[in-house]
Amino acid sequence: GFYISCYETTQLVWEAVMGSNPSFFPGANQPVESVSWNMVQTFINKLNNTYHTNYRLPTEAEWEFATRGGNKSKGYRYSGSDVVDDVAWFSNDELEHPQPVGGKTPNELGLYDMSGNIFEWVNDWYGKYSSKPQVNPKGPDKGSDHVLRGGSWKHSSNGMRVSFRTSIPTTRLNKCGFRLAKSASIASAVQSINNSVKILSIAYYTLDGILANNPSSHHIYVKVIRKEDGSVTRNMVVY
């Protein structure tokens, strides 16, 4: 199993980790864009090393399972609806740039912008689908292009379909970003360990170390958990 972010990774999160913002269209709660696949890997490595997490890009199979609504799927053409305007920012909206994340209706799993807004990098190299049934395929071992899913603000409704896929080399485009995933086995193991020791306190701090008594939505904090065995864990979270 796996976990996947409800939102596309925002410029706020990217800048908090990397210290700079590569996006062509600035906006804290807009998805980070103009990032290549390789740049995303650098971000994920720094995020994991800094905050002791295990994030990664979703595989293409995981991404499609999620965009279709997972085990709650109702078989929609787009992610969460048969009416594209309900769930996707796309070319008919006559937009000049991507929109802040979470502005449309989520899909059956509560995931936003799986159709439209920006294309999303997945982990896989691009390759033709196998003609044989497969369970959680991982794509080719090597290639020249990586897969993009989801469509973008520049594309027609055809690109918003849950089955639509394309690919490009690892280059930067202002219509391409990503969302984070995490393997459930790792997350479950951590949760199991955490539950075996009594938690004494949970506090949120801003990135410059100031205690946040009333955390605000869509802001980044360091979550500090202190337990009775004296251990302290710190993780970056978007509240």
Where are these regions (language model features)?
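Hydrophobic alpha-helical segments, especially N-terminal targeting/anchoring helices
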Residues: Y112-S115, Y205, R226
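A residue-level detector for well-ordered beta-strand positions
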Residues: Y7, Y55, G110, I202-A203
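Short, small/polar residue-rich loop motifs at catalytic or cofactor-binding pockets
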Residues: K104-N107, V197-L200, S217-H219
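Short, structured beta-strand segments at or near domain termini in extracellular proteins/domains
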Residues: L173-S185
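Residue-level detector of functionally pivotal "anchor" positions at catalytic/ligand-binding pockets or at interdomain
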Residues: K182-A212
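Functional-site microenvironments in short loops/helix caps that host divalent-cation chemistry
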Residues: S23-P26, P31-V162, P169
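A short glycine-rich, aromatic-capped structural motif
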Residues: G1-P22, S115-G116
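C-terminal tail/sorting-segment detector
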Residues: K175, V222-Y239
